[in-house]
């Protein structure tokens, strides 16, 4: 497993904008990486099986050594428990995709913090301004975005961005007489245009 350095830059900026200390941020990053990677050597601020199977951890378990499939799995990481979770969870997502990119054409006026985190020098005020003046048709690439906001300093990319989506949330509901059933699926389309189900939950029958 190779950590995605661009995603780490974006994560660090979100934490900075949310007034999370550098130490706490480094703990979150290292604990996430240790949970995913296959080795048993903890990083500087990380934790491995010796902690997760030890007496100080209420949930006795081993690190999964795989990527996260749902946001709730992050609750296994000590740095995200308690007040940290309440403070940060709305700004987080989790998909088992190392090259995950955010389609900025889907962002809304309330996503200024996320948008700001994707560029090294983009201020929160400028991010809010851009999203308030974002065309309904979106942009086709970075050059078009930059040309439309030439007075704004973006800096370098500090996250992976896209202008189209390849992850979709499909919700279905069926009813036969008195019986109802529903499902919720996350579907990921790779470059070969084939769809792969990342997760699926059923309710009802």
Residue ranges, per PLM feature:
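Compositionally biased linear targeting/interaction segments
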Residues: 1-205
């Amino acid at each position: 497993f190779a950590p995605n350095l661009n995603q780490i830059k974006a994560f660090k900026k979100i934490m900075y904008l949310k007034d999370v200390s550098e130490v706490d941020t480094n703990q979150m990053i290292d604990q996430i990486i240790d949970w995913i990677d296959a080795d048993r050597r903890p990083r500087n601020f990380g934790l491995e099986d010796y902690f997760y199977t030890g007496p100080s951890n209420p949930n006795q378990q081993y690190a999964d050594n795989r990527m996260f499939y749902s946001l709730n799995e992050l609750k296994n990481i000590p740095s995200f428990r308690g007040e940290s979770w309440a403070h940060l969870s709305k700004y987080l997502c989790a998909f088992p995709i190392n090259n995950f990119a955010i389609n900025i054409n889907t962002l809304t006026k309330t996503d200024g913090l996320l948008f700001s985190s994707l560029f090294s020098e983009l201020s929160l005020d400028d991010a809010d301004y851009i999203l308030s003046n974002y065309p309904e048709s979106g942009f086709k690439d970075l050059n078009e975005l930059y040309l439309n906001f030439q007075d704004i300093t973006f800096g370098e990319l500090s996250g992976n961005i896209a202008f189209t989506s390849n992850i979709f949330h499909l919700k279905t509901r069926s009813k036969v007489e008195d019986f109802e059933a529903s499902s919720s699926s996350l579907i990921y389309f790779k470059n070969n245009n084939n769809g792969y189900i990342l997760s699926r939950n059923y309710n009802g029958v």
